[in-house]
From Swiss-Prot:
Domain notes: Consists of 3 domains; the N-terminus binds the ribosome, the middle domain has PPIase activity, while the C-terminus has intrinsic chaperone activity on its own.
HAMAP family in the cross-refs: Trigger_factor_Tig
Pfam family, one: FKBP_C
GO cellular component, one term: cytoplasm
Domain PPIase FKBP-type: residue ranges: 162-242
Gene Ontology MF terms in the entry: peptidyl-prolyl cis-trans isomerase activity; protein folding chaperone; ribosome binding
Region (Disordered): 428-449
Protein name: Trigger factor
Keywords: Cell cycle, Cell division, Chaperone, Cytoplasm, Isomerase, Rotamase
Name of encoding gene: tig
Role this protein plays: Involved in protein export. Acts as a chaperone by maintaining the newly synthesized protein in an open conformation. Functions as a peptidyl-prolyl cis-trans isomerase.
Catalytic activity, reaction form: [protein]-peptidylproline (omega=180) = [protein]-peptidylproline (omega=0)
Amino acid sequence: MKSAVETLSPTRVKFTVEVGFDELQPTVAAAYRKVAEQVRVPGFRPGKVPPPIIDRRIGRGVVLEQALNDAIPQFYGQAVDEAAVAVISQPEIEVTNFADGEGLTFTAEVDVRPTIELPDPESITVTVDPVTVSDADVDAELAALADRFATLKPVDRPARRGDFVTIDMTVRLDGEVLEDGTVTGASYEVGSAQLVEGLDEALEGLTAGQSAEFDAPLAGPYAGRTARAEVTVRAVREKQVPALDDAFAQQASEFDTLEELRAHIRERIGRTRRIQQHVQARERLLQTLLDSLDIPVPERIVDAEVRSRAEQLRRYAEARGMDAEGLLAQQGESLHDHEAHVRADVERELRVQFLLDTVVAREQLQLQEAELTDYLIQRATRLGVSPDDYANQLVRTNTVPLAVADALRGKALTYLLQRVRVVDTTGAPVNLEGGSTPAAEAEPAVSEA
């Protein structure tokens, strides 16, 4: 076999492969055996029909076609191995010559991972925010905890912000009650802005038994129109928050004193922020590398992924009785802008994958069994399924190699992060140990092939 590689672009090559007919003989012989298993000829057992009989009965051309279908993947794979390129898509094959006795010539165009010259990670400095926990941070957490233990006490006074009221409400448009426009006996926090615009202002100052009408600007399919709403207050209750003392600490936690509870909250906030700092370091390292490297992406893969995501959006909108443009309009985004954002996201995801795949290849990183197990557990947890179910899903969908590649990229990012210099905004060195994040969190994956 002879093969040549022509570089069409930094992300696409063209193979020209020539295979002599002598080299095809094993493939032709195997094709005869396959065909013999499929034909039934009186006097011969299945699989035992001689080639001359097959030629006379169904024609040698059928056998040669089978041999061609088997030979192309085999010799294409050999050509890829010899060229030592990382293919990332299915090849576009064109047979330029194949005749009985003359051998085979074909071309294959395919997308490849671009060559990336990585900088020495030890020359890179990543700056992150420092981890600090103030008394105000602890106070805010304590206040939120106390709020969860608050009780509601009926009061005989006008409603004000922070009160909980029991209400009946009807919303009409052009005199007709809207679908889902009736609320009966609902508990509502005044000032929470959770139902319709204008409700909070209408409720303030009302006592139990009083009603009010107000204009309610609508959203969704009625965006731009204004309904008329009527609300009646049936009861007003005041939220009573427990005092922050040792008794509260014993009620709300396993600690005996408020100071012990405060110390625990401070430590928990610090732990969370160290994880956030680690995530920030990963993101800023990736962005630093992307900014310093020119990493091309194959347009065919980008276009295919953009189309796939557009179809997902279309189905999502359709399931809600809308089209994609209408759904995006509710979110304040045009279809054109959305497509531009999706394309930019896909291109960035591909660049990150190429970057990390290059690290994997250069450093010959491999996954240990425990690392793969951790990755599967983390991914399963994020998806809300058991690790066994997630692993079985990967097997059923033939996506185990994609999961392994994704886990390796996470390991590559960790490898880089361990070798760069990390400082906070004051210039102090940062030790990221203890703030590690799962490999599954690294970057969303784009299916390449």
